[in-house]
Amino acid sequence: MIRGAMPKDPYWKFIPLYDLVIVPTNSIIKRILLNLAPPVPGMKVLDVGCGTGADLKPYGEAGCEIYGIDLSPSMLGRARNKFGGSADLRLGDAAHMPFQDRFFDLVLSSYTLHEMPNNRRSSVINEMVRVLKNDGNLLLTDFHTGPIRFPAGWIGKAFITFLEILGGREHLLNGLNFLASGGLQGFIEPFRFNVDKKEIVGGGNIALFLLSVNLGSNPP
């Protein structure tokens, strides 16, 4: 989850339930994520909008070097308690990351882009590309426009909408804008990434894209 462009920290109130409720609901998606980008010992993995670190945990357990960045002090505090000193976790803006060029083998970002204002999403994705090795991969998970399958997709859509409303007005409006612009698939198309693998899950509500950078293309 992201805290990408909001100066306040509206996520503190969700901390007691985040790992207890939200993380388990994503357990199937996490297994798919690991199948798309299996951990390899020694690989450098960054999670942009790392939240409490749930997506990083299996990579750390497999012997990867794990890094995370988030703008929510409360989420990052929970992640630091979880990992101790075994992860390099930074409080910061995903549009201006404190990492060197071409450093990471894998850059993850789950449910991050939809939470940002539209004018910041391109800056964040360009930062992800900057810190990614030329032969590395981006693994993005976020909302998909469908078609939404009945009944599972409709139930999932209602649950997602409920969570978005809980996030507050700005959060909700950013998510609606993201979907109106084509969701994750619509967002990544102008960047001309190579789509190495793709999964649509959650009854059509969620897309996972494993991407590599087309070195011959220019960012939009």
Enumerate the predicted regions with their spans.
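Conserved class I S-adenosyl-L-methionine
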Residues: 1-40, 54, 58, 156
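C-terminal alpha-helical "lid/dimerization" subdomain adjacent to the S-adenosyl-L-methionine
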Residues: 141-191, 197-205
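A short glycine-rich, Lys/Arg-flanked "PGG" loop and its adjoining helix->strand segment in the class I
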Residues: 122-134
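C-terminal lobe and adjacent flexible extensions of AdoMet/dcAdoMet transferase-like proteins
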Residues: 208-220
